[in-house]
Amino acid sequence: MPNAKQNLVIVESPSKAKTIGKYLGPDYQVKASMGHLRDLPKSTLSVDIEHDFEPEYQPLKGKEDIIADLRKAAKGSGRIYLATDPDREGEAISWHLKYLLNIPDNETYRVTFNEITRNVVQESIQHPRPIDQNLVDAQQARRVLDRIVGYQLSPLLWKKIRKGLSAGRVQSVATRLVVDRENEIRAFVPQEYWTLDVNLNRAGKPGSFTAHYYGDPQKRELTSEQDVQSVLDALEGQPFSVTGVKRSEKKRTPAPPFITSTLQQEASRKLNMTPRRTMMIAQQLYEGVEISGEGSVGLITYMRTDSLRISEEALAAAGDAIRSRYGAAYYAEPRRYKPKSGAQDAHEAIRPSNVALYPEAVEHDLTKEQYRLYKLIWSRFIASQMTNALYDVTAIEAACGSHVFRATHQSMKFSGFTAIYEEGRDDEQEKLDSPLPDLAPGEALTAAGFDKQQHFTQPPARYTEASLVRAMEEKGVGRPSTYAAIIATIQDREYVIKTDKKLSPTKLGEVVNGLMMDRFPNIISVEFTADMEKQLDQVEAGQRRWKSVLEEFYTGFHQEMVDAEEALKDTRLKVPDEVSDEKCEICGRNLVVKTSRFGKFLACPGYPDCKFTKPITEKMPGRCPKCGSAILKRKSKRGYAYYACERGAACGFMTWDVPTDQDCPVCGQTMFKRSGKGAMKPFCANPECSNFLPEDKRGYRRKSTASGEAATAESNAEAAAEAAQKQAEEKKAAKKAAAKKPAEKAAAKKPAAKKTAAKKPAAKKPAAKKAAKKTEPEDDLPF
């Protein structure tokens, strides 16, 4: 039993609670809310538009025990500190906790931590503040906006395209960016151009180099082979000479420390992590991980930020670490980076909480992903405070008549920050020339040969997850806290598909985008969406009322909905079949993707003349708990669905439980749920996690099936599935036989039978409710 005078501190997750509890001592009891406890229920719109857009919040289903536990703890506590994350979402969680626990205004103590370290936690507890209602209102405005758009637009898509689709205020714009880029690629007309290189030798001295054609003497583009040939004709048999040598020093400055968007981009480039995975691992590093001899330690600062600000203490610590580890030459003075226009400066940039915790010192305490991301954050921050990298650059100009060729080479003079870190790039890096001989102006040269190459201009590259994050940031679409969820959502909805790290729209995505462009130009407008983000920022700053933002938005949106319903009254849009690369084994046509009530499959487009079909491998949400690869849905020969790692026998993971798009709030691994009737809410299947749910508590008793260890090959899985089917058939037959006698008795009792028949409509209600739940619209950013 906690001491009656203990203070209660409420955070979101158990790992954060554990870390903070270590720093506060026995006078404080730290509990976790496990995220949101109160929200708009999914079953209805839950926004009273007629009464000033009043939200109708309710406690979340499945959180009753947590709420009861927090209420019990609150009754016997001293002060109650609400210590959720330092952003809009965290402020809203605290606001809902205040309501659920019935905490008076004058007894509300809100505390935030930019980093979870002893000094920061203890200092914050000593200086609590009231809940910032402006932050809460900005979150409410965003939540209600997304609910209205999602719940009113999605049913229109169901009626006009297909069931189960969704639209959202930000996800629709992100989809548009991908579709627009694809249209640019399709419309692109390649332009021919040529390059001409010459291999030059020094006259009477060792040393040669390659130079590139520049012009005659002004810069000239070679657009055809005829252009190249005219240059070659002019050069034939003529001498070359060095007309210019320029030597200079070039410096490169380090990139600033990470903000949310740049962390997601760099983790995608260097670590091959999705934005969603990056944020999940970063959350673990922020909230605390077990470090040998230290207990639970928060390793990085808060990871949802667009600020480049760094505290003076952190700057000093970085300088000390650089001087001691790399030497005084690698550190000159603190670098203070200017914030971008429109950036919110409430938090610092993303950095290590304690730079003295070198990545290699904590590697054995972290998972592979945690270590790689921590090392990336640590290296980027330290590099941001190091001296410039210096290069010696030599540029040579050689001429033959009026035709000029150039060659450039750079060599490193001082490594500076590049000793530990260099920023990744989305585009291909330029090929560097070979070292150049020590030439002097006027020196004679001879041409040893020419190399002409034909090229064509390339279309704009498809977005990667990293470059889409950058585009959303540059255009003002979404906020740092939403990028990862939005990019995951448009892929989960199958509006966008990722192939070889490149994002392209699906046929479905293009049809939905076309309808949105035609009927909802504001919702799909990049400028409109960016302006809405600015209005939410104004609400946060206390410059606008949140309900006035909703009212202004809804007036135009409602009219667009009315117009769209009328214009599309007799319209049904068809989604073209996705054409696969696989060929029909009978007639040779490219198979197309079809959907039945059992899921997707490949079929010949020549139906009914050709009836060839083939099962398709479906990619599931989440990641393999053993190796982190994708999880695929497979079927046995008897049609039973099971889920296995895409690496097959190389990994060996297999389960009958269904992967979900939810991650465990404690360990971060993918959560699963039982298939079929009797399934409970998603559970954690990681036996090393404190949130692990044992086999016997996962919803219903399962028959004996192939275990994960025994299922390293598909044949094992199929054999188990067939055995399970046989058991099911035997059980079904037994039930049927057992039901005969009661059925005969019921037939003999006609009045009783009538009474049962009269109750049938009532019996259908749960089924109707279940069916309705399957077609609920979804918000832009569901919790």
Map each language-model feature to its residues.
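Metal- or metallocofactor-binding catalytic centers and their adjacent structured scaffolds
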Residues: 220-256, 443
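Alpha-helical scaffold elements adjacent to nucleotide-binding pockets in ATP/GTP-utilizing enzyme cores
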Residues: 19-23, 69, 92-100, 120-124, ...
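Basic, low-complexity terminal or inter-domain segments flanking catalytic cores
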Residues: 2-8, 19, 154, 187, ...
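Intrinsically disordered, low-complexity regulatory segments
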Residues: 1-143, 152, 214-215, 219, ...
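Conserved short loop/turn motifs at secondary-structure junctions
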Residues: 5, 85-86, 162-166, 247-256, ...
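Short acidic, hydrophobic short linear motifs in intrinsically disordered regions
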Residues: 242-245, 254-267, 294-303, 459-471
